[in-house]
Amino acid sequence: MSAPLPASLAVEFCGLKLASPIVLLSGCVGFGEEYTRVEGFSNTDVGAIVLKGTTREPRLGNPPHRVYETPMGMLNAIGLQNPGVDKVVDEILPSLDFSETRFIANVCGSTIEDYVETTRRFEDSPIDAIEINISCPNIKE
């Protein structure tokens, strides 16, 4: 006798249909490829993956030490380290399997023009949605 199949966890958020209400937030799994390296997990386990914060130009991020372990978890101050939107769109996105889950870009900038230009680069990409990051506390600008 086989176990009954679980009920669907599908949800709709802002017109975007997700197979599950579980969304991996920006930075948790980099640009998505890290998640599939964890044994027993796949992109189909989540409704969406929000990519690591992406800026118009590459950023080195903050100098070390950027991660601090606490008794209740960890704190980080990565500083939006990323290869820049051109590399994300041209090299990283083509390596992701968009048939398995939804992908949401996290767009960061220092000026309105940065946000506009970074968002424009995602227009013709397979990204399902864009999240605007206006609150990263780990950068000086």
Predicted regions: what is each one?
Residues 1-103, 108-110:
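N-terminal capping/small domains of soluble enzymes
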Residues 43-44, 110-141:
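Alpha/beta enzyme core
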